[in-house]
């Protein structure tokens, strides 16, 4: 049996990194939970003397025939002055009848129009499509939705009310829900993950630090802000996260508005999930490479802190989990011996219980999600679903650092037989 001091040191260092992040996560959980309690009693309304501004709703679409009609139905059903809305579907070279569906619905509702991306500019990803749409839009307020979204009627109204009533805000971000969450085990895990992210990371960071990350859909932003920061980065696979940093550097903020809800499809196949999550991870690699070198110069300071947290979460924590898992397996098989002194088994048990407690309480903020079955899934996710992220991060690092593969936008597979919420 092999043993050495460096193995013990490696194990202790991994435990220290994990517990530092667990402590910070616990703080975000508490502040996020308190924010969820406060926001439950707040109905977003316009400040006195203000009027509802005209909004351009932009929807990038590439081969979205399965879902685009339902999305347009929901966008047209917004509880918002009808004469203050234009809906632009950015058709990025669709070959499945998406354009024909949009044209048919546009003939019935004058607010809808299709913007065809020129062939020589097509297939360059969401950022490029949105840039074309902004240039073609006419209103000062921009709202972004993905082509599979089913926003609730009051969603746009909530986003706009908070944004217009607070001059310090550059954008407002709503909440997304998983429309196909009951389809299979994977979508149930994704549903739990999404709720935990929003009520812990989004709500917690907003309440504690005044920070929120643009999620890529269900958000409203001022046109002049987009112009000031130079629009979307066309090289970014996670254009929302990259844009968030540049917005905060202007001194403005982005607010999480949980009353603004949209329902979206999530991957139903593990293969689709890996493709999507790898794109996210590679997108974050790009963001880190672009902005991490300016870490000490970033303003406000909380922005630098948040980027550092993201770096630790993606790399240090994943490395610590991988190392601790590996040492645990090697020690359990008798190949190595660890002699680090400390109540590590009790610490691990406490970390596990905190995970279950935090996510379980978070689920209680959503109607119908705090079931015993979901609590069992939370326990299972700790040992299964959460560990899949290790593979995603390693795969993304291999693609970017070792193999240096070209970053290409990978469209997420859609499913047509999902009922509206």
Please give the residue ranges for each predicted region.
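N-terminal signal-anchor transmembrane helix
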Residues: 28-84
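Cell-envelope/extracellular polymer assembly enzymes that use nucleotide-activated donors
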Residues: 53-56, 86, 227, 242
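Long helical/loop segments within the catalytic core of UDP-sugar-dependent glycosyltransferases
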Residues: 106, 110-140, 153-237, 278-289
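Juxtamembrane C-terminal module of membrane proteins
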Residues: 27-50, 293-309, 327-421
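A conserved acidic beta->alpha catalytic loop
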Residues: 82, 91-100, 119-121
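Catalytic donor-sugar/metal-binding loop of nucleotide-sugar-dependent glycosyltransferases
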Residues: 244-262
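Acidic donor-binding loop at a coil-to-helix junction in glycosyltransferase catalytic cores
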Residues: 237-243
């Amino acid at each position: 049996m092999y043993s050495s001091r460096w193995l013990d040191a490696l194990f202790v260092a991994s435990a220290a990194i994990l517990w530092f992040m667990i402590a910070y996560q616990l703080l975000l959980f508490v502040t996020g939970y308190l924010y969820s309690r406060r926001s439950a009693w707040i109905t977003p309304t316009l400040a006195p003397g203000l009027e509802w501004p005209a909004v351009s709703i932009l929807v990038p679409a590439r081969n979205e025939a399965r879902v685009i009609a339902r999305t347009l139905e929901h966008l047209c059903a917004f509880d918002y002055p009808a004469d203050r809305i234009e809906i632009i579907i950015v058709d990025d070279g669709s070959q499945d009848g998406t354009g024909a569906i949009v044209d048919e619905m546009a003939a019935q509702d004058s607010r809808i129009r299709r913007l065809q991306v020129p062939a020589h500019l097509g297939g360059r990803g969401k950022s490029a499509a949105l840039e074309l749409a902004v240039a073609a839009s006419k209103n000062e307020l921009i709202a972004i939705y993905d082509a599979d979204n089913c926003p609730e009627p009051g969603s746009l109204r909530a986003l706009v009310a908070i944004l217009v009533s607070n001059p310090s805000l550059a954008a407002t971000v709503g909440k997304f829900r998983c429309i196909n969450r009951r389809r299979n085990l994977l979508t149930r895990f994704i549903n739990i993950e999404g709720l935990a992210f929003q009520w812990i990371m989004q709500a917690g960071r907003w309440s504690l630090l005044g920070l929120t990350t643009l999620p890529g859909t269900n958000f409203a932003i001022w046109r002049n802000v987009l112009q000031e920061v130079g629009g979307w980065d066309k090289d970014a696979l996670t254009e929302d996260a990259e844009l968030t940093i540049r917005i905060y550097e202007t001194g403005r903020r982005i607010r999480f508005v949980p009353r603004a809800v949209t329902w979206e499809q999530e991957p139903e196949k593990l293969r689709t999930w890996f493709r999507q999550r790898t794109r996210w991870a590679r997108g974050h690699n790009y963001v880190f490479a672009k902005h991490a070198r300016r870490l000490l110069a970033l303003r406000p300071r909380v922005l630098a802190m948040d980027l550092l947290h993201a770096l630790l979460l993606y790399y240090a924590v994943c490395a610590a989990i991988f190392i601790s898992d590996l040492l645990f397996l090697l020690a359990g098989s008798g190949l190595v011996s660890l002699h680090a002194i400390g109540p590590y088994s009790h610490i691990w048990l406490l970390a596990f219980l905190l995970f279950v407690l935090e996510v379980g309480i978070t689920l209680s903020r959503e109607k119908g999600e705090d079931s015993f079955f979901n609590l069992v899934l939370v326990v299972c996710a700790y040992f299964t679903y959460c560990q899949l992220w290790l593979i995603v991060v390693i795969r993304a690092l291999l693609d970017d650092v070792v193999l240096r593969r070209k970053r290409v936008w990978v469209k997420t597979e859609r499913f047509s037989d999902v009922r509206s919420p």
